């Protein structure tokens, strides 16, 4: 009798401990998803404002075209995260899970390409200014953005088809090959982003001809730093998905939720960066319109030089795409 009671107590304690641990995991999971929804909604509002201002209220230059498309990619990415997190928290039917997966991949790749393109083009404009201003085709930014959207969509659809996300067809080795191709694509973009940003920094800080730091340089630098710390882990985790799930799916789910939250912080941070950079060195304590702040963040002329120019001259600088 005593042995039976002891065994029952041990089993009961083990079950209670397992239940407590499971309840704790569910609570953390729901809390993280709830925070993701809050951050994503804030980011949707911020990127929506940037889209609205750049599309309809500001003249666009070569770089603001990329910023406009980056805001579009961030908006799409955050929207998918809101839908996915709400489905998890409310325990809704997730029949759309794989569709959201493809759209998330599409938006993430497009956003990374836009940031890499901004950094690379800014580096070219500083390293070889004469060639850049004289030889650069007029509609390069628009063409590059179109290519980015198309290539990101095609790559996402091919991965979705090959890995069984869209249809029942699934080829393990083909899926792994696609994952390696996509990972290589990410590595190339990351190298372009890192090298161009580092070269730009070296040129500005240690170059023989000192180049003044503009608001737009600060905007690019902060955007790149935030992406490396908050956005890059999502890409690393995403394309290790098949390998991680083979070893420990629980570990992957926990890590993935955290990284998903960080990537939402990255997409939410970009509009905040624009408006904060636009408000730097404003001595007059008065409310500045978001349009004016965003225009200042896109300003690629030194502070002293831009202060001497009239409004018509400054707006003229923003018309070349």
Swiss-Prot record:
Region annotation Disordered: residue ranges?
299-321
Topology of the protein relative to the lipid bilayer:
Multi-pass membrane protein
A GO MF annotation of the entry reads: G protein-coupled receptor activity
Q: Which InterPro entries match?
A: GPCR_Rhodpsn (IPR000276), GPCR_Rhodpsn_7TM (IPR017452), MRGPCRFAMILY (IPR026234)
What is one GO cellular-component annotation here? Answer: membrane
CDD domains linked to this entry = 7tmA_MrgprB
- The portions of this protein that span the membrane are 34-54, 63-83, 98-118, 147-167, 173-193, 216-236, 258-278
Residues carrying sugar: 11, 16, 94
Family assignment from sequence similarity: Belongs to the G-protein coupled receptor 1 family. Mas subfamily.
- Listed name of the protein: Mas-related G-protein coupled receptor member B4
What species is given as this protein's source? Answer: Mus musculus
